[in-house]
Amino acid sequence: NAFWAGVTGEVTYWDPFRIAWDVNYGSASYEDEKMNREGWLASLLLEYKLDWGTPGLYGWYGSGDDSNPRNGSERMPVVSANGNNGFSNFAFNGNPYIAREGVLGTNMTGTWGIGARLKDVSFLEDLKHTLRVNFMGGTNAPKMAKYVSHNSFKDSASVTQYGTSYDPMYLTTDDYALEIGLTNTYKMYDNFTVMLDASYLALWLDDSRSTWGKNPMANFAKGGDGIYDAWNVNLSF
């Protein structure tokens, strides 16, 4: 059995100031209790529209797994792995065009984050820029790390948002990441758009023995100090 419910809304009374929010809850139950999933994900956006662009602040929080893998997952179950969002184009799936994305995960379940952006900045006709900075972390119990690091990459799917998911990363409450991204779009013709996306992601994994130990993310890194980074420059049409 599975159930989802959500509510979304916005306040534009003080236009050009806008407040928007989104709250979702989902659960999925199976005969085997270890496969059960139940959780929620919420986000909040504050933005102010100006003539040259729209600055904004936002944040999100998704429930994470507790320290007991036998009672199922406390992350919200999802049907599609393509969980698009408007906050992150690199760490999560947020790019509407062909791009490299989802470096941390296909959606934001099991994570929290705060961010700031300058959206649709434009000084030339049909050319827009969006700059974003996100700081995020996991909401999963550190103890759950051993159930990932002590198994193969494929087996680690059992502690992600649903059994057949292969998210690249599994963040605990002791893990953090910083994302900086710049998206540029040029509408050359009505039906032809050129997009240049540049992003950088720094990741800090807790390499203490209580979390990832000396081998953070089995089959992801061999040794190291728990600090990793990735970058991407992507051109699409």
Can you name each region flagged by the protein language model?
Residues 5-7, 42-44, 116, 182, ...:
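Membrane-embedded beta-strands of outer-membrane beta-barrel proteins
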Residues 10, 20-24, 56-60, 130-134, ...:
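Transmembrane beta-strands of outer-membrane beta-barrel proteins
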Residues 1-45:
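A compositional/structural signature marking long, glycine- and acidic/polar-rich segments
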Residues 15-19, 52-56, 124-129, 186, ...:
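Repeated loop/turn-to-beta-strand initiation elements of outer-membrane beta-barrel proteins
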Residues 11-13, 46-50, 61, 120-122, ...:
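Residue-level signature of outer-membrane beta-barrel architecture
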Residues 227-237:
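Outer-membrane beta-barrel "beta-signal"
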Residues 26-169:
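Extracellular/periplasmic loop regions
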Residues 190-220:
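C-terminal beta-signal and adjacent terminal beta-strands/loops
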